[in-house]
């Protein structure tokens, strides 16, 4: 059983949703970013998505684009992102880490060495936003062969004809993007999310995590009543942007994570 399967199974047994947090690797700098990464589980993160900075993050809203820019300016590379995961795993062998980003940096790194190093570092899953199922052979197949889950994004515009193709080789969990557009934009209605989850469940047994537009503990709790996972990214990344120092960035991100976790954990009581 993979770490992701294990975590979602444990939470299902507890009768609660997972808090899935997104931060960009290397934002605001390597050391502070590593501190945030290491602090997230104790602050209540059940699964961590770690963004791999790339110069052209087309699916991301302004907050995550700026985070990517800060990380790249601070010297973050894909090799350093894998190093962060290695350092995280020294103290934590249970919290799943999913790398999220675009195919270009992986292609440049080399798929074979990337998959081998990601597995050795302790990466559990990949979300690659610009690789559709038609390109499975490039990365999804070798990653899954190495025991790394490949997580697909589905959106309100993924129709019933397309959905089986998208979900066919998915593993780990399904990431439902509740608002069509870029990250951090708007938020979906509870009714919309309820219908979307019901539709996805007709096609897959995988846990369903809902993200995009969730910013407050209240919003997180509302989604946690419906979905297997609640993904929060831009709201955490904004705390880094607003911080006056690296220490403040660490503290503010972890404080918000704790508040979100409280919302998620109390949602079904």
Curated annotation (Swiss-Prot):
Its EC number is 4.2.1.20. One of its GO terms (molecular function) is tryptophan synthase activity. It catalyses: (1S,2R)-1-C-(indol-3-yl)glycerol 3-phosphate + L-serine = D-glyceraldehyde 3-phosphate + L-tryptophan + H2O. It comes from the Bacteria. Keywords: Amino-acid biosynthesis, Aromatic amino acid biosynthesis, Lyase, Tryptophan biosynthesis. The active site is at 49 (proton acceptor), 60 (proton acceptor). Gene3D superfamilies: Aldolase class I. GO terms for cellular component: cytosol. The keyword Amino-acid biosynthesis applies. InterPro entries: Aldolase_TIM, RibuloseP-bd_barrel, Trp_synthase_alpha_AS, Trp_synthase_suA. Pathway: Amino-acid biosynthesis; L-tryptophan biosynthesis; L-tryptophan from chorismate: step 5/5. It is an enzyme of class 4 (lyase). Tetramer of two alpha and two beta chains. Belongs to the TrpA family. The alpha subunit is responsible for the aldol cleavage of indoleglycerol phosphate to indole and glyceraldehyde 3-phosphate. PANTHER family: TRYPTOPHAN SYNTHASE ALPHA CHAIN, CHLOROPLASTIC, TRYPTOPHAN SYNTHASE, ALPHA CHAIN. This is Tryptophan synthase alpha chain. It comes from Pseudomonas putida (strain GB-1). The gene is trpA.
